[in-house]
Amino acid sequence: MSGFKGYLSTVPVVFAIWLTFTAGLIIEINRLFPDGLVFSF
């Protein structure tokens, strides 16, 4: 089990999980609030 915990704490795994979380968050924000990059005054 300690080997698995050591594997999960490596930088590429943490980086991949972080990118997946960030991409999912951006996708959901764009799904709920589309055209967020367009400034409509």
Curated annotation (Swiss-Prot):
Signal peptide: none annotated. Gene3D superfamilies: Single helix bin (1.20.5.510). It is found in: Plastid, Chloroplast thylakoid membrane. SUPFAM superfamilies: Subunit IX of photosystem I reaction centre, PsaJ (SSF81544). Its main location: plastid. Keywords: Chloroplast, Membrane, Photosynthesis, Photosystem I, Plastid, Thylakoid, Transmembrane, Transmembrane helix. GO terms for biological process: photosynthesis. Coiled coil: none annotated. This is Photosystem I reaction center subunit IX. It comes from Bigelowiella natans (Pedinomonas minutissima). The gene is psaJ.
